Swiss-Prot record:
Name of the protein this chain belongs to: Molybdate/tungstate transport system permease protein WtpB
Record's subcellular location: Cell membrane
InterPro entries registered for this protein in UniProt: MetI-like, MetI-like_sf, Mo/W_ABC_Transporter_Permease
Topological region Extracellular: 30-55, 112-114, 185-222
Transmembrane regions listed in the UniProt entry: 9-29, 56-76, 91-111, 115-135, 164-184, 223-243
Family stated for the protein in its record: Belongs to the binding-protein-dependent transport system permease family.
Amino acid sequence: MRRDYTLYLFAALGTFLIAYIAVPIAVIFLKQASDVEMLVKTLHDPYVIEAIRNSLLTATATALIALLFGVPLGYVLARKDFPGKSAVQALVDVPIVIPHSVVGIMLLVTFSNSILDSYKGIVAAMLFVSAPFTINAARDGFLAVDEKLEAVARTLGASRWRAFLSISLPMAFPSIASGAIMTWARAISEVGAILIVAYYPKTAQVLILEYFNNYGLRASRPIAVIMVSLSLGIFVILRWLVGRKNA
């Protein structure tokens, strides 16, 4: 029997990509380990702590807003056919392909000074670029739920709202949760749109760029290490919680 090396080839190709992602993460931690003094100094810098807090809070607020509006939209896209549905679905994906500096210009032109240099501006920029992940995940989650289950619940006397809460939402939850996690992750990584809309109050993403431009790599690297650590930690915990929910 002829030996099939397809899986070995795929594994080798996949390993290259995993290494491409993992190696820079490992290297930045190893480099910072040789400069603990700068890391400790950064951890005690109130300006840095405030910027990190701003990033975490605004990214979390963005994910919650995306859930509030994205889950209902995802449900409608999964359950109903209507004129212009394809256009709506295409529009949902548009923020993914628009350059983020352009997003910042668009938001600034649209909302002007009402979002300039404010928490509202940060959340607005984050929401624009990250909401598609929640909407698409919710839509896919509801599409995976057999609509007949809702119909059976309604024949037994449940309202559409009740059927949604008791059947569709719990069954689609893993997909929705994954979308929310990706929304949060995308939001906390946003820089381009925030630079234009809300340079202040400072977020960690913007502060890293500012420190790099003004003080060089040694000053910006500790903040990057802190953000990678926090993001990875939160991401792993959230994925674990979703995995437990699926089990």
